[in-house]
Structure formats: C-alpha cells, structure tokens
Curated annotation (Swiss-Prot):
It comes from Cytophaga hutchinsonii (strain ATCC 33406 / DSM 1761 / CIP 103989 / NBRC 15051 / NCIMB 9469 / D465). Its EC number is 3.1.-.-. It is a single-pass membrane protein. It is found in: Cell membrane. HAMAP family: RNase_Y. This is Ribonuclease Y.
Length: 522
C-alpha cells in the first residue's frame, strides 16, 4: 500500500516537473515573440516620429522663411517711404533756402533804395527849410509894409476883420434861423394835426361808464328770505364778509349790490350766485364761500392780466405787473373802466409812435402801464403817476417807460420822446364825450379816504364804507379792543371824521367786536 502511494507520488512529481519544463519552454518562446514584435513596433513608431519631426521642421523652416521675407518686404517699403519723405523734406528745405535767399536779396535792394531815398529827403528838407526861412522873411517884410500903409498893426487889422465877419455871420444866421423856425412851426402844427387825426381814425373805442351798483338776478322772490336769514343774520354776515351793502327791496327777481369797490362787488355777486346754487345759506357757509370766491377772483385777475398782455402783444412783464393790469378790470377812473382806458391808451400810443417813426412796442407798453399806480393795494400817499413809476422801476422796466409813466401828469420832467406821446394819448382817451364822470371819481375818493381814516386807528382790522358813505362799519380785534374801548373808538373816529372830512348829512360809525371760541371734538 505504501509502495503504491509512493509510486503515485513519484509519478505526480515527475509529471509536475515535466509540466514545469514544458511550460517554461513555451513561455520563453512566447516572450521572445512578443519582444520581437514590440521592438518592431518601437522601431516603426520611432521612424514615424522621425518622419513627422522632419516634416514639422520643414514647415517651421518655411514659415520662418515666409515671415522673414514679409518682414524684409515691410522693412524695405518703410525704408523707401522714409527715403521719399527725406527727399521731399530736402526739396522743401532747398526751396525755402532759395526763397530766403531771394528775400534777403530783395531786402538788401530795398535797404539800398531806402538809403538813397533818405539822402534825397534830407536834401529836399534842407531846401524846404531854406525856402521857408526866405518866405517868412518876405512875409514879415510885407506885413511891415502893409502896417505902414494902413496905419494899423497886424493884430488890430485881424481883430477888425474878425468883427466884420462875425457881424455878417450873425446877421445871416439870425435870418436863417428865423426862416427855419417859421417853417418848422408851420410843418409841426400841420403834421401834429395829421398824426392825431390819423390816430383817432384808426382807434375804435367804446363809450363805457362804470357805476357803483351791481344787480344780482334771482329766479324767484322766495330766495330773498333765505338770503336775509333769521332776523337778518345772513345778510349781515354777507355784508361783513364782503364789505358791500346788500339791498333786498321790492324790486322783482333782483338783489342790488352797492359798493364803490368793484372787486368787493364782484366777490359779493359771485358768492351770492354760489350760495343760491348750493342752497345752504348760513353765516359759517357764507364766510367759507366768500373766502373761496375771493381766492378764485384773484386767480381770474391774473388770467385777465395775462390775456390783456397777449392781446396787445406785450411780453416779458413781471408777474406782479400782470396782477396789477388784471386789477384794472375792477377799477374805474372818473367812471371810465381803467383796463379799457389803459388798453385804449396803449393802442393810441402804438399808432402815434409808428406815425412818428418811434418804437411802437415801447410806446404800447408804457401806455398799458401808465395808470398801474391807481390799482396798487397799499395806496401810499403818493400821486398815482409817481407810484406807478416806482413800481415800474421795482420790476425792472426800462428808464424810458418809467419816465413816461411818471411824467404823464407832469409830476416829473419828461426825458424821452415816448413820454409826451403817453400824455397826449391819455388825454385823448379821457377827453372823449361821455368817457368820464368827475363826480363819480370824487365820490369814490371820498369813500376811500373815509375807510383809510378808520384804518389808521389801532385795533381796526377791516373797515367798509356802505350806503353811499352814510355808514362806516368797522371790524376790530376782540383781543386788543374791549367792549368799553369799542364805544370810545367809535366816538374818536366820528370826531376825527368831523374835523378832517367834508360830507353832506351825517355818517353812522358802527364798531363791530366779535369774539369767537373754537374747539374740535376728536
């Protein structure tokens, strides 16, 4: 048994050894074959790499050669350009050198000519000086001979001759001046008449006269009771807020608004219109509507001023001057509407200035602004012409226009040609039949003076002259004026009116002191 095992083991060992030897031989054979193939592939790769390297080398050499040729060509072209430029510059330099040489030759020749001219002039000057001396000697000798013959010295003869010539010239000049003056007077009178007639013919005017009453039409008389209010409280509130007199009488379907200030009358009329349309009429609502209406009317005044300036072709007016022009619509002068009058004067001035060959635009501007002093709200103690001139200066109007405004009533001296034109046209506009009513102007001035007198007292807030100046209603500051002082103030104002003013009949002075306490519930 053991022998069999030994035999099997021996056989296995021998088989393994033979297998190892055979495997080694086969492996060596395969390895040699792979090694040979690898060497062949390596040689092939090396050859291909060498071929590619050779080809790349040739390409790079070609590129380098082409780049070199390109640079060479550019260099040659640049060199040629620079050579050409150098050649051109050299030619220019040569030309300049030639020009300079010619100029130097010319200058040299001229210097020589000038030297010769100097010599000739010097010699001629010497000759002239000698002749001058000879003539001077001859003149003196002739003068001496004439003095001996005439028995007069040279100065005496000269003075006698001058006196004779002066007398003849004075006589001729006097005759000539008289003739020219007579002709100028005849021509000026004729031309002035012609210009005024042509100006009047070219101006179409309306014959409009203002009054102190406005009529407010209503649909039915039932509304009158609402306007009057309980115990007249509504109408009193309306009169106190607007400063006019509201007359509610038997006139059918009409309420009369009386007041000398057209702005106040217009505020009252518009306020009544709004209140009637709204239907709510009570003191608080009246104050609210009057305030809004006054603000709206102020905007309308500016719009009227702007529209007037545009219609007349006047540009560049200061906004405050435009406001004053708009206020003219609600102001009358001797019963004549001030805006209509100013527009009329502006057109007349433009026409007359164009006939005289002057600046029509400047004349038109001066004509429109000549009465702005009448509508200035503060109305200081100055003539309206001087006040208008100061306002025009304040708002940068030209000196010519300022003088025309200030001189149109001869308060100052006229310095420009536009000033007499404005004065004449103002007179033409006011002198038309029916254009003005002096009584109306005096009446309005008396009412204004009455209000100004009351406003001069301390504590007075507002003052309105109503009922054609027969009543003066004064609103005072409740904090500064007590009930006792209100009576004293009324007496003092009445006494001052008696001393300083002239008036028919009597004037009722009413001082109104109103105390209001307002709080808000939140």
């Amino acid at each position: 048994m053991s022998e069999l095992i030994m035999y099997i083991l021996a056989t296995a060992v021998v088989s393994i050894g033979v297998g190892i030897v055979a495997g080694k031989a086969i492996f060596q054979k395969d390895f040699s074959k792979q090694e040979t193939e690898a060497k062949e592939k390596a040689n092939l790769i090396i050859k291909e790499a060498e071929l590619k390297a050779e080809a790349t080398k040739k390409d790079k050499q070609l590129e380098a050669k082409e780049h070199f040729l390109k640079l060479k060509t550019e260099f040659e072209e640049d060199s040629n350009k620079k050579k050409n430029l150098i050649i051109q510059n050299e030619q220019k330099i040569k030309q300049r050198e030639q020009t300079i040489s010619k100029q130097m030759e010319t200058n040299t020749r001229r210097e020589a000519e000038l030297d010769s001219l100097r010599e000739n002039l010097s010699s001629q000057l010497e000759i002239l000086n000698k002749r001058k001396e000879e003539l001077e000697k001859l003149r003196h000798s002739q003068i001496e001979k004439l003095e001996k013959i005439a028995g007069l010295t040279g100065e005496e003869a000269k003075a006698q001759l001058m006196d004779t010539i002066k007398e003849e010239a004075r006589t001729e000049a006097s005759s000539y001046i008289k003739r020219i003056t007579d002709e100028a007077k005849m021509t000026a009178t004729k031309d002035a008449k012609k210009i005024v007639i042509e100006t009047l013919q070219r101006t179409a005017t309306e014959n409009a006269v203002e009054n102190c009453v406005s009529i407010f039409n209503i649909e039915s008389d039932d509304i009158k009771g609402k306007i009057i209010g309980r115990e007249g409280r509504n109408i009193r509130a309306l009169e106190a807020a607007t400063g006019v007199e509201i007359i509610v009488d038997d006139t059918p379907e009409a309420i009369i608004i009386s007041g000398f200030d057209p702005v106040r009358r217009e505020v009252a009329r518009l306020s009544l219109h709004r209140l009637v349309q709204d239907g709510r009429i009570h003191p608080a609502r009246i104050e609210e509507v009057v305030t809004k209406t006054a603000k709206h009317l102020d905007e309308e005044i500016i719009e009227i001023g702007e529209r007037t300036a545009i219609d007349l072709g006047i540009h560049g007016l200061h906004p405050e001057l435009i406001r004053l022009v708009g206020r003219m619509r609600f102001r009358s002068s001797y019963g004549q509407n001030l805006l209509q009058h100013s527009r009329e004067v502006a057109k007349l001035c433009a026409t007359m200035a164009s006939e005289l060959g002057l600046n029509a635009k400047v004349a038109k501007r001066a004509g429109l602004l000549h009465d702005i002093g009448k509508v200035y709200p503060d109305e200081p103690e100055l003539p309206h012409a001087i006040l208008g001139m100061e306002l025009a200066k304040k708002y940068k109007e030209s000196a010519e226009i300022c003088n025309a405004i200030g001189a149109h009533h001869d308060e100052i001296e006229m310095t420009g040609l536009i000033s007499p034109i404005v004065q004449v046209c103002d007179a033409i506009s006011g002198a038309r039949p029916g254009a003005r009513r002096e009584v109306m102007e005096q009446y309005i001035k008396r009412l204004k003076d009455l209000e100004q007198l009351a406003l001069s007292f301390d504590g007075v807030l507002k003052c309105y002259a109503i009922q054609a100046g027969r009543e003066l209603r004064i609103m005072v500051d409740a904090e500064n004026v007590s009930d006792d002082k209100a009576g004293i103030l009324s007496f003092d104002i009445a006494q001052k009116i008696e001393k300083e003013m002239q008036y028919p009949g009597q004037i009722k002075v009413t001082v109104i002191r109103e105390m209001r306490a307002v709080n808000f519930a939140k």
